[in-house]
Amino acid sequence: MSLTLERGAIAPLPVLQDNIIWIWSCGSEAVVVDPAVAEPVIEALQQKGLTLIAVLQTHHHADHIGGTPDLLRQWPDAAVIASGQDRGRIPFQTQPVAAGTRFTLLGVPVDVIDVRAHTSAHLAFFLPEGCSPGGHPPALFCGDTLFSGGCGRLFEGTPDDMHRALQTLATLPESTRIYCAHEYTEGNLRWAHALQPEDRAIKARLEDVIALRTQHKLTIPSTLAEEHRSNLFLRAQSAAELGRLRQLKDDWKGF
């Protein structure tokens, strides 16, 4: 797997059908976010001469934690950072964290944000100073909560939960890069355009996304500013509106 990594960089590793594993590196050390599988991660890190020091787990679903046990066999000293409320479902975690706390990785602060909705203990990890000191934009690892053009399904939460979570994320800086865990942008925007064909921001973004996907390029990370303009779920004014949109999206058969 060819991976382009610079010092203090976050790089995507596409796996399975649409998962994105994020590899955040600085110097010779790396942090991996939501590793669905291990083999391509091991290959990529070894290719770049990187040592895994930590795994960030946003939630317990198999396509986010499936590769972690094998990564720990390869790098047994790596920390596994996850919600302390989810010890039963992420039993190999070594550093339980709680919402509202801060820790340091690769020399920069990481804030833990409660975004329970998709699952009951879902966390997001926010890097207010970016992925390394020195002027990088803020970064958000948000798992399956805020997607590019969409939001996660409500498996264990309610529309109120998701609305609260998204409104919390909406207060972050507009320049924040959104590192979500799936490449869902085209489908999300096709649905949004079908629902609101007159919305110019959605239409323009969809055209850009289709052009990228035609070239087999990723559409993420996006920015919070872009999501404010064209993400119907982030724009929802109430939990009731979000719930209506979520049901419409769940029932949509278009893409």
From Swiss-Prot:
- Return the InterPro entries for the record: Clx_II_MBL (IPR035680), Glyoxalase_II_hydrolase (IPR050110), HAGH_C (IPR032282), Hydroxyacylglutathione_Hdrlase (IPR017782), Metallo-B-lactamas (IPR001279), RibonucZ/Hydroxyglut_hydro (IPR036866)
Under catalytic activity, the entry for this protein gives: an S-(2-hydroxyacyl)glutathione + H2O = a 2-hydroxy carboxylate + glutathione + H(+)
Q: What is its EC number?
A: 3.1.2.6
Q: Please tell me where Zn(2+) 1 binds in this chain.
A: 59, 61, 118, 144
Q: Does the keyword DNA repair apply?
A: no
How the cofactor is bound: the record states: Binds 2 Zn(2+) ions per subunit.
Key words, A-Z? Hydrolase, Metal-binding, Zinc
Q: So which domain of life are we looking at?
A: Bacteria
> Could you identify this protein by its name?
Hydroxyacylglutathione hydrolase
- What gene does this protein come from? gloB
